[in-house]
From Swiss-Prot:
Gene that encodes it: adk
Protein name (database record): Adenylate kinase
Binding annotation for AMP: T31, R36, K57, L58, V59, G85, F86, P87, R88, Q92, R156, R167
Organism (species): Burkholderia thailandensis (strain ATCC 700388 / DSM 13276 / CCUG 48851 / CIP 106301 / E264)
Keyword Cytoplasm: yes
Main location per the UniProt record: cytoplasm
Region spans: LID: 122-159
């Protein structure tokens, strides 16, 4: 099971990724984790990547793909792998294709932006314990107060509506075109000897268990 998980920030990809990893016994490939590990280990690619990071520059796609190919050779990838948050752009998707990285499924978790804004901007956090609430879906017993300590809850900057909207704008511009890219490739079929992944789209609305059932149905 070799899979790319697509969906906007706040669509619930992280939760479903955990279910997929457990069911199929595959690792989640995070480019951020890979970069940190390569830099820490001082591998040739890690040293090269660190030079970009130290200058505050984006690590080039060619380097990221090199790290991906190294990571996929490891034993835990024998049964497959799950990409979450990569590729983010058409250029990265093209680079993956050119590098011959095989993918069986591209799964999109679709949630309307209005729902994502409500989900994320309604979150409230108790800073000391990390306990989280939601003003609509999981409110505290007393508005604005932690259930256990009675201390005030905060809204993290990441959860503020204007921040959420900005992240969704970036997704719309950069990552959403991948949905068309993979949908078109699935229609065309094999290219450069690489089998096109099957493209599946499911609704990310409803209870977590309902969404999980949809995910597993889509991956049959």
């Amino acid at each position: 099971m070799r899979l790319i998980l697509l969906g906007a920030p706040g669509a619930g990809k992280g939760t479903q990724a955990n279910f997929i990893k457990e069911k199929f016994g595959i690792p989640q490939i995070s480019t951020g984790d890979m970069l940190r590990a390569a830099v820490k280990a001082g591998t040739p690619l890690g040293v090269e990547a660190k030079a970009y990071m130290d200058e505050g520059k984006l690590v080039p796609d060619s380097l990221i793909i090199g790290l991906v190919k190294e990571r996929l050779k490891e034993a835990d990838c024998a049964n497959g792998y799950l990409f979450d948050g990569f590729p983010r752009t058409i250029a990265q998707a093209d680079a993956m294709k050119e590098a011959g990285v095989a993918i069986d499924y591209v799964l999109e978790i679709d949630v309307p932006f209005s729902e994502i804004i409500e989900r994320m901007s309604g979150r409230r956090t108790h800073p000391a314990s990390g306990r989280t609430y939601h003003v609509k879906f999981n409110p505290p017993k007393v508005e604005g107060k932690d259930d256990v300590t009675g201390e005030p809850l905060i809204q993290r900057d990441d959860d503020k509506e204007e921040t959420v909207k900005k992240r969704l704008d970036v997704y719309e511009a950069q990552t959403k075109p991948l949905i068309t890219y993979y949908g078109d490739w699935a229609t065309r079929g094999e290219e450069n000897g690489l089998k096109a992944p099957a493209y599946r789209k499911i609704s990310g609305l409803g209870a977590v268990d309902e969404i999980r059932a949809r995910v597993f149905d889509a991956l049959k």
